Amino acid sequence: MNILNVVRRFEFQLFLVNVIIALFFYFENSAYFSSNNITTIFQYLAEIGIIAIGEAMLMLCGEIDLSPPALANFVPLITLTIYNSIYQAISPTPAIVVSILLSLGLASLIGLMNGLITTKAKVNSLITTVGTLFLFNGIALIYSGGYPESFPYFRFLGGTVSILPVPFIWSLGALVFLILLLHYTKIGVWTIAAGSNPTGASEVGVPVDRVKIINFIIMANIGALVGIIQGSRVLTIGATNFTADVVLEGIAAAVIGGTSLVGGKGSLVGAFLGSVFISELLNGFNILGINAYEFDAILGGAIVVVMVLSYYAKRASYKLKSIATATSSSPEGKDRITKILKFKIQKIYRRVEENE
């Protein structure tokens, strides 16, 4: 890849926008680049960034999940309960590992439920996960009585290394893992195919429902991890730690980063850079004394602009494919399109197998 191709990439352009924003806030207030403020930016970026890349994966296959805040509130309560039940029987460190793994297993079951309702019962994922959001937020409130719980045993997950918060390091690890999953495994191939053309992908052997369920499970685990990591940082957990704002900002970051809401197109790096964009604005506005309401208005405006541009880009793409669409109405046209799609998927399979 030459320099010109790099410059043309949307991710590079978004990176430059983030640099310009950071420099603007620095010239407005030099405290913006202080070590304490950088740590603050990274702390918020860690949470929204993990959610953004998870949502980007799910949006790539044409679905969306609004339930992570509920899982971030509910699952850590279960983690703490398991830890308190077993730490005396085994030493504290193994108890931490076991409690996290078991609670992530619970999160996986919730993700499986979201996936099955969406794919098998044919309920729109937006409706499914709004229901899950209210369901598990309610359970968390009942379970905790509405009171916060102390969460001191997991503090190492939320500490700092120099000016870098440990949660930010976790977010980078999640980004690398999902990039490898998307670009170098069959699950990644299936994810893109399912979002691009679910009917055609199914005809050439892609297990569309299965890959969507897998991505719902991944998203549920991400929501749970965000709750555990944030609880480790502030040393308390509860049913009101997270609101729907965090997932909406994560989705906004994914959209700003170039991920299409209708599936098949997107970038995990772009989603993470979108998280940087939102984190910089939120922190910079706070330093400049701009209130949160104005931030919400500006963020909403940015999302509307991106969505309008995305709509016209999609419309232009449909026009370019009009000939193929017209020919697909005949049996010969359908066979030809199916063969082309099958060839492309098999080509990607070969690339994945070579990397394995």
UniProtKB/Swiss-Prot annotation:
The record's statement on gene disruption is: Deletion of the gene results in a growth defect on D-xylose and L-arabinose.
Name the species this protein comes from: Sulfolobus acidocaldarius (strain ATCC 33909 / DSM 639 / JCM 8929 / NBRC 15157 / NCIMB 11770)
Report quaternary structure and partners.
Answer: The complex is composed of two ATP-binding proteins (XylG), two transmembrane proteins (XylH) and a solute-binding protein (XylF).
Membrane-crossing residues?
A: 14-34, 41-61, 70-90, 96-116, 126-146, 161-181, 211-231, 242-262, 266-286, 287-307
Which InterPro entries does the record match to this protein? Answer: ABC_transp_permease
Relate the induction remark in this record.
Up-regulated in the presence of D-xylose, L-arabinose and D-arabinose.
Q: In the UniProt record, which is one GO cellular component term? A: plasma membrane
Q: Membrane topology for this entry? A: Multi-pass membrane protein
Q: What does this protein do?
A: Part of the ABC transporter complex XylFGH involved in the uptake of xylose and arabinose. Responsible for the translocation of the substrate across the membrane.
Indicate what this protein is called per its UniProt record. Xylose/arabinose import permease protein XylH
Location(s) in or outside the cell = Cell membrane
Say which family it is in: Belongs to the binding-protein-dependent transport system permease family.
Give the keywords, sorted.
Answer: Cell membrane, Membrane, Sugar transport, Transmembrane, Transmembrane helix, Transport
Any one GO molecular-function label of the UniProt entry: transmembrane transporter activity
Q: What superkingdom heads the lineage?
A: Archaea
